[in-house]
Regions:
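Extended assembly-interface regions of large multimeric machines
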Residues: 1-230, 236
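Mixed-charge (acidic/basic) macromolecular-recognition segments
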Residues: 1-34, 38-41, 236-295, 479-518
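Short, Φ-rich (hydrophobic/aromatic) sequence segments
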Residues: 53-57, 79, 217, 326-328, ...
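Residues at beta-strand starts and edge strands
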Residues: 93-95, 174-178, 195-197, 220, ...
Length: 616
């Protein structure tokens, strides 16, 4: 899609040319002697030099007009950069990676922790198109900490509940059982595992059934059984042993900022990369005795997921339908900008990551800015909005980064400019010094054409044999820096002064808020928002035992009604995200709760929450 600002500049240029030619025609009619000499009487000059002057003037005036109008949106953009930078920055490509571990290369007692932000580079390039030669510049990083295990899924099977009499005795409503059989990735690799942490799985069924499968687990899972390698039930646990991932504060896709509210971050994650929520974890393997095997067998243990609904036959299942050792990865990485000499001739300075190939990199966020003097002394410059700038220190400079649409790139993208101010809030810069910045970058749209199965290698050490993409990278999306959208986003973030309790406006208010997070090309997201038929809110009370205090909280109970025919995806997942968002509207010593309905059918009811904590 062509960038909005370029379209706007073209529109301004056309209007300026039409105005010039129209006025020229009128001028020629009024002053034929002068106009005939200039050949303007027909509104379009036959003299190429005159036409060149007209077009040059129209371009200069339209560009000036665009710059003046863009100034009015800078305040909103700068404020958004401070509080919610992910709403201003472009959205990089994201994917799901599968890690093949070496079970004897590390201590896997409670799982090996692969830190968030671990970098990966592509190897053994598969694609043969023109872009494949540049894939080597791409870098992906893990979004958050991931536990790896020397295990693999051997089989995923639907089984009859009659095969497990113990489960039928424990759960009266059991209808079917989903058995996930685990095996050692290497013989003997699982002998010293303690399983002090839960085991996390990724749902990798056929794309059209992924969210249906998640919906079934969400709504119909009532218990979990743990079986040993011989198939004997060792533990029977309730639904609490099962958890859908992606909702915790430390499970954000994009680099977090302490100022970002979790509810708004989840909305952004959901509408940009919903596959992030296709993870679930199971507890119960802790203290499981691993029998000594007389011969090498790969089977280790199994999970039996107890469901009160039969699994649809149309969902094909095999040993690759559910995977271990997977994690979301994003095309974000740290990179240092090229040095920029500072002088008094320019009031702002453009950051460049690679002057030879500027299209290969785009800045997602500026982390730190440094300056170096002629003696090689380096110092860090503080952000303009930092309290440190107000300290009475000589030669103290503050910096502000501004995102603007690039007119020089072949591909869509933004440029980043740095402006400097002194402690008196006047434009000033560390002249005769050289500046550079530590940034978080992406590769623009380069990674989105990578194929499924592309191999990667970890940059650094780790007990990994290989890394592969199990899903095609999502599309890169350039941020919208239009004036109207920026002010809409900023006003939306003032949600604490907005009420959703008005029955006549609650549904429309919620729809308008969600529209700000959905890309116009995301038809599924658009249909999900359009499926919201009703949002009701009423006052209520809920018991609480937080901190040993027993009593009642006052709060708001929301009821969300969706149109089942319009909605596409997992309604319960959608409701879980909205439940966290609605929690932002609760005040101190109050709660919020959500009940989800599809038409007249009650689907799910979440426990009351105060902030993002469930009331005990």
């Amino acid at each position: 899609m062509v960038a909005t600002s370029r379209n706007q500049l073209n529109s301004y240029f056309v209007s300026e040319m039409e105005a010039l030619r129209s006025n020229a025609s009128q001028f020629g009619e009024k002053y034929p002697n002068i106009a005939s000499e200039l050949a303007l009487s027909n509104g379009r000059s036959r003299d190429p030099h005159v036409e060149h002057l007209l077009q040059s003037f129209a371009w200069m005036h339209s560009r000036l007009r665009l710059m003046v109008e863009s100034e009015s949106s800078k305040l909103a953009t700068i404020l958004l950069q401070q509080f919610y930078p992910q709403l201003v920055a472009s959205t990089p490509s994201m994917s799901i990676a599968e890690f093949e571990v070496d079970g004897f290369a590390a201590n896997f007692g409670d799982g090996y922790l692969l830190p968030g932000g671990s970098l990966m580079e592509p190897v053994n390039l598969l694609s043969t198109n023109e872009a494949s030669s540049d894939y080597g510049k791409c870098r992906f990083s893990t979004c958050y900490d991931t536990l790896l295990w020397p295990l693999e899924v051997l089989s995923v099977k639907k089984e009859l509940s009659s095969q497990y009499p113990e489960l039928e005795t424990r759960f009266s409503r059991v209808q079917s059982v989903l058995k996930i059989e685990l095996g050692e990735s290497q013989p003997g690799a699982a002998e010293n595992l303690d399983f002090g942490n839960p085991v996390r799985f990724f749902i990798d069924v056929d794309e059209e059934y992924r969210f249906l499968f998640l919906e079934i687990l969400y709504r119909h899972l009532i218990g979990v059984a743990v079986l040993d390698h011989e198939g004997k039930i060792r533990k029977i646990l309730d639904r609490g042993a099962f958890k859908v991932n992606g909702f915790d504060d430390d499970e954000r896709i994009f680099p977090r900022d302490s100022k970002q509210e979790l509810g708004l971050t989840l909305l952004h994650d959901y509408f940009t990369f919903p596959e992030k929520f296709l993870f679930f974890e199971l507890r119960g393997l802790e203290s499981l005795a691993v029998a000594t095997k007389e011969e090498e067998v790969k089977e280790f243990a199994s999970f039996a997921l107890v469901l009160n609904e039969k699994l649809p036959e149309k969902i094909p299942l095999n040993h690759r339908s559910i995977k271990l050792n997977c994690a979301p990865v994003t095309n974000l990485f740290q990179k240092t900008s090229e040095p920029i000499p500072v002088n008094n001739k320019e009031f702002r300075h453009k950051l460049a990551m690679d002057r030879q190939k500027p299209d290969d990199y785009e800045i997602y966020r500026v982390e730190k800015v440094f300056s170096i003097d002629s003696r090689g002394q380096q110092r860090e410059l503080v952000p303009y909005f930092s309290p440190a700038l107000s300290e009475n220190v000589e030669d103290k400079y503050g910096w502000i980064s501004q995102f603007e649409e690039s007119y020089h790139r072949k591909n869509q993208g933004n440029d980043v400019w740095l402006s400097f101010f002194n402690a008196d809030h006047e434009r000033d810069a560390p002249t005769s010094e050289t500046i550079f910045a530590k940034t978080i970058c992406c590769n623009n749209s380069l990674c989105e054409s990578m194929p499924v199965g592309q191999e990667f290698a970890l940059i650094g050490s780790g007990p990994l044999n290989s890394i592969k993409l199990v899903s095609r990278p999502s599309r890169y999306r350039k941020s919208s820096l239009g004036e109207e959208r920026q002010w809409q986003l900023l006003s939306h973030l003032s949600l604490y002064h907005v009420a959703l309790s008005e029955p006549n406006t609650a549904r429309d208010s919620l729809r308008q808020a969600l529209d700000l997070y959905v890309n116009q090309e995301d038809l599924v997201g658009q249909r999900q928002i359009e499926s919201i038929e009703q949002l009701d809110a009423e006052e209520g009370v809920a018991p609480s035992k937080i901190g040993g205090w027993r009593g009642y909280y006052r709060g708001t109970k929301y009821t969300l009604v969706l149109n089942e025919r319009k909605f596409e995806g997992s309604p319960t997942l959608f409701g879980s995200v909205l439940n966290q968002y609605l929690a932002l509207f609760s005040h101190i010593n109050s709660f919020s709760s959500l009940e989800l309905k599809l038409g007249n059918e009650r689907v799910f009811k979440w426990q009351p929450m105060t902030g993002h904590k469930i009331l005990a």
